[in-house]
Amino acid sequence: MSMKYLMLLFAAMIIRSFADSGNAIETTLPEITNATTDIPAIRLCGPEGDGYCLHGDCIHARDIDGMYCRCSHGYTGIRCQHVVLVDYQRSENPNTTTSYIPSPGIMLVLVGIIIIITCCLLSVYRFTRRTNKLPLQDMVVP
């Protein structure tokens, strides 16, 4: 039983590699056969599979009853019904430039930091100016 699943997995990987290259499945679908019979393990669905896969090709696996979908590029899901979303940053036009305007909150924080630094520098300047004006006799230690 595990050999059948291994063959199915191998066939799915081959089909997926052909799908990524953009080739049509009718021309690239490998014919995987069992040693005892000449019936392909994976084949395209017949007329019963028309419309089963919304954005892809219907595949029937001999060992597992049921139909499965091989989704086209950009789609995912059991029946290829979901669109794969691309990153917004990569989908933008590269020729456009984006300018960022800082919010008023950020501007207030920056102005506050500048005011605090200015106040600290002024207090240090005033303190050193006062100590420099002291007479020399006040600085002598008894």
Curated annotation (Swiss-Prot):
Ranges in the topological domain labelled Extracellular: 19-100
Transmembrane segments: 101-121
PROSITE patterns per record: EGF_1, EGF_2, EGF_3
Residues glycosylated per entry: N34, N95
Residues in compartment: Cytoplasmic: 122-142
Record GO terms (molecular function): epidermal growth factor receptor binding; growth factor activity
Disulfide bonds, paired cysteine numbers: C45-C58, C53-C69, C71-C80
SUPFAM superfamilies: EGF/Laminin
Record bears the keyword Ribosomal protein: no
GO cellular component, one term: extracellular space
InterPro entries documented for this protein: EGF-like_dom (IPR000742), GF_C11R (IPR011170)
Signal peptide region: 1-18
Keyword entries, A-Z: Disulfide bond, Early protein, EGF-like domain, Glycoprotein, Growth factor, Host membrane, Host-virus interaction, Membrane, Secreted, Signal, Transmembrane, Transmembrane helix
Keyword Transport: no
Induction: Expressed in the early phase of the viral replicative cycle.
Stretches assigned to the EGF-like domain: 41-81
Top-level lineage group: Viruses
Site (Cleavage (By host protease)) residue list: T96, T97
GO biological process: epidermal growth factor receptor signaling pathway; positive regulation of cell population proliferation; positive regulation of mitotic nuclear division
Role according to the record: Stimulates cellular proliferation (hyperplasia)and mobility around infected cells to promote rapid and efficient spread of infection. This effect is beneficial for virus replication in vivo, because poxviruses replicate possibly better in proliferating cells than in quiescent cells. Acts by binding host EGFR, inducing its dimerization, autophosphorylation and leading to activation of several cellular pathways regulating cell proliferation or cell survival.
Family membership noted in the UniProt record: Belongs to the orthopoxvirus OPG019 family.
Quaternary data: Vaccinia growth factor interacts with host EGFR and promotes EGFR dimerization.
Name listed for the protein in its UniProt record: Pro-vaccinia growth factor
Source species of the chain: Vaccinia virus (strain Copenhagen)
